[in-house]
Amino acid sequence: MTPVNAKHYLHDDIIRKLTELKLAELSDYVDELCADPECVNLDFIGKFEVITNRLYQNRINELIKNLLKNATLREPQASIAGLYYEAERLLSRELMIELGTCDFMRSQTNIIIEGPTGAGKTYIACALAKAAVGKCYRVKYIRLPDLQQELEDCYHYNRSLKNLKQKYTRPALLVIDEWMMRASSDSLSSFLLDVMEGRYTTSSTIFCTQSKQESWHAMLGGNTMAEAIIDRIVQNSLTITLGNLNMRALRNPLMKYKNVKE
């Protein structure tokens, strides 16, 4: 009989097989289970359920960790629970709690967050994005100026434009920050049309912007391509318009608002 490893309850051969199956952590779970007095009286099925649940939760935690890393959120610490509600801010607690369930993604609804600089648009978007990550959705955050730079680099260094399109078409939730802060180039507008077309009716996008929607048409070129981009965004969208409360000022430690989380 194969000897039992002095450090483990399972035989060395079983541990080797688990490792080959990419289930090496099961050996540790068995050790912990056998050492737990509360699990001594569990039958086989009970112990199997404990180990399976532990393995499943560990894999989910690792998945969420990797998804959050790949999301490249500007504010990865953001959360729905950390949102600040003040009458002057015009932000609905009920709406944010509802959006935090990520049900809007099932209907491929886009969210447009409008507000002046410092209103906390990025934090809200990242809070929703992090909620989506917590439900194991693939998420990506990008500033539009950075996306434009990536596109220019693609052309300059002859990189794959197809790969760049897939990078922003595939995520279940895409966050585009600093949307329409300046006029778009023809190449960027063309790229945005391809991305929006690829995401239309399949996934959701969050736009953070200081610009009113009425100004987008001119900033996107004032042509039929601009109309096509806007149509794919706004036809199935929800707009959150924030007030003039400056969240950066509230986060300043010199201000009297000491309990502001956002």
Where are these regions (language model features)?
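Interdomain "pre-motor" coupling segment immediately N-terminal to P-loop NTPase/helicase cores
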Residues: 19, 23-75
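Post-Walker A helix-loop "phosphate-sensing" segment adjacent to the P-loop in P-loop NTPases
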Residues: 130-142
